């Protein structure tokens, strides 16, 4: 069993999603958004750090998965996103959580099957995979999708490692 915290970073809205993985079964534990209503960036970063720390304390995750920074058209926005992402990662590492990073395209490919999927498609698939009564908010859905991606990728890595080990031992032909 593992609890995974997914984070969709943003300087104004940071989505989070928490799921539990038992074998191949995924279950929803919680999700939401950290909203920073103050104007100055240092105060927003402080709120993101405090919010992520509080979520970690509440859910006690085993793994922390976060979206990688993509290059936006606006360099200033990309820098702010990188800073928001950085404080979230610091909150995780301060709690000794292992951090895993996934590209947005990889998350969409894993959850929807199309790397260029729309936000509404991600929301629908997250709702379906986690058996939720309604679509989660867009930022929370993205965070849940990041957590789901971590589960799928870590399972695949474990299976490949086991197969390689069995091949090395001569158990598979």
UniProtKB/Swiss-Prot annotation:
Pfam family, one: RuvC
Cofactor note: Binds 2 Mg(2+) ion per subunit.
EC number: 3.1.21.10
PROSITE patterns attached to this UniProt entry: RUVC
Binding-site positions, Mg(2+) 1: 8, 139
Subcellular location: Cytoplasm
Keyword Nucleotidyltransferase: no
Superkingdom to which the source organism belongs: Bacteria
GO MF entries: crossover junction DNA endonuclease activity; DNA binding; magnesium ion binding
Protein name: Crossover junction endodeoxyribonuclease RuvC
Organism this protein belongs to: Klebsiella pneumoniae (strain 342)
Origin organism lineage: Bacteria, Pseudomonadati, Pseudomonadota, Gammaproteobacteria, Enterobacterales
């Amino acid at each position: 069993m593992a609890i995974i915290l997914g984070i969709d970073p943003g300087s104004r809205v940071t989505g989070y999603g928490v799921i539990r993985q038992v074998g191949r079964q995924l279950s929803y534990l919680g999700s939401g958004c950290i909203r920073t209503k103050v104007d100055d960036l240092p105060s927003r970063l402080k709120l993101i750090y405090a919010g992520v720390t509080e979520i970690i304390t509440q859910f006690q995750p085993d793994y922390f998965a976060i979206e990688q920074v993509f290059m936006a058209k606006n360099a200033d926005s990309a820098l702010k996103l990188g800073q928001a992402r950085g404080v979230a990662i610091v909150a995780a590492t301060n709690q000794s959580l292992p951090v895993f990073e996934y590209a947005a395209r990889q998350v969409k490919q894993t959850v929807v099957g199309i790397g260029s999927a729309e936000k509404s498609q991600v929301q629908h698939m997250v709702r379906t995979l986690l058996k939720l009564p309604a679509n989660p908010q867009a930022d929370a859905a993205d965070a849940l999708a990041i957590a789901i991606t971590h589960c799928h990728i870590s399972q695949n890595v474990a299976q490949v490692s086991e197969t390689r080990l069995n091949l090395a031992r001569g158990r598979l032909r």
